[in-house]
Design a protein with these regions (language model features):
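His/Asp/Glu-enriched, well-ordered alpha-helical/loop segment
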Residues: 1-83, 103
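Metal-coordinating catalytic core of metallo-dependent amide/deamination hydrolases
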Residues: 21-22, 115-121, 126
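Glycine-rich loops and low-complexity Gly/Arg-rich segments
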Residues: 40-44, 105-109, 121-124
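C-terminal cap of metal-dependent C-N hydrolases
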Residues: 61, 73-118
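C-terminal recognition in membrane/secretory proteostasis and scaffolding
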Residues: 87, 99, 122-131
Length: 131
């Protein structure tokens, strides 16, 4: 469905990969990969760069804040994830995460690896089990 919405209005649709689920929100890149693969199988020519917009600039556009965030440009707010490999692969891991320009996670530095429910496993994702 994402690829179909993406191709609406002569390819100017504003497709978004989203999740209301506490687990799914942590895997939007993989959901985008599945949608890209399904779209390509259906005959749409969807590049990885184009599919990346489904989880970056398109949500910002839909929220009316594309002038503030959604892409890496001078003057825009951005949180950035550097991956160990292809961000659409289930085998890639977040190597570094920058939030508001500050290093928030570094897989090679144990001092910058916050404990999260993602690391602990999801039992009841609605509750805070870290503290």
């Amino acid at each position: 469905n994402i690829a179909i919405i993406d191709q609406a209005r002569n390819g100017t649709g504003c497709a978004i990969v989203h999740s209301d689920d506490e687990v799914g929100i942590q895997h939007l890149n993989q959901e985008a990969a599945k949608a890209m693969a399904a779209g390509n199988r259906a005959g749409y020519d969807i590049s990885k760069a184009h599919a990346m917009r489904w989880i970056t600039s398109n949500p910002a556009k839909a929220a009316g804040i594309l002038n503030q965030t959604g892409s890496i440009e001078v003057g825009k707010d951005a949180d950035v994830v550097l991956w160990t490999g292809d961000p659409f692969s289930v085998y890639s891991r977040a190597e570094k995460v920058l939030i508001d320009g500050a290093l928030a996670f570094d897989m090679k530095d144990p001092k910058i690896q916050p404990i999260t429910d993602f690391d602990l496993g999801i039992i009841q994702p609605q509750t805070n089990r870290v503290n």
